[in-house]
Amino acid sequence: MVQIIFDSKTGNVQRFVNKTDFQLIRKVDETDHVDTPFVLVTYTTNFGQVPASTQSFLEKYAHLLLGVAASGNKVWGDNFAKSADTISRQYQVPILHKFELSGTSKDVELFTQEVERVVTKSSAKMDPVK
């Protein structure tokens, strides 16, 4: 079972992850130790930047990061959910989804499918017998 770790400033990301059926959901600032692979869901701040709290968390635990999703607001144009682009590039992980504000039911469905895909792919790498 994969854990979803999220960072939320206004509550949009928390509302999004709470709509999913994932059982193990933890917030970045309430996570004192991570020792299993995880998917990160974060927000975008200022003009397309990764939040400082997310960046600090990743400095310690990026080696366990499987993929990233991000929230944003489409009024920011090219900076919409840009934190996902930055994290993906910096840590060489896939962008699983970008969603506006707290997302729609379709966003939750697409995110869930992508998480399942990346977890399956990761499991196959760890257990090459499959």
UniProtKB/Swiss-Prot annotation:
GO BP: protein modification process
Pfam families in alphabetical order: Flavodoxin_NdrI
Gene3D superfamilies tied to this protein: 3.40.50.360
Domain of life: Bacteria
Cross-referenced InterPro entries: Flavoprotein-like_sf (IPR029039), RNR_Ib_NrdI_bac (IPR020852), RNR_NrdI (IPR004465)
GO molecular function: FMN binding
HAMAP family: NrdI
Entry's family note: Belongs to the NrdI family.
UniProt function note: Probably involved in ribonucleotide reductase function.
Cited PANTHER family: PROTEIN NRDI
Name listed for the protein in its UniProt record: Protein NrdI
Species name: Bacillus velezensis (strain DSM 23117 / BGSC 10A6 / LMG 26770 / FZB42) (Bacillus amyloliquefaciens subsp. plantarum)
Upper taxonomic lineage: Bacteria, Bacillati, Bacillota, Bacilli, Bacillales
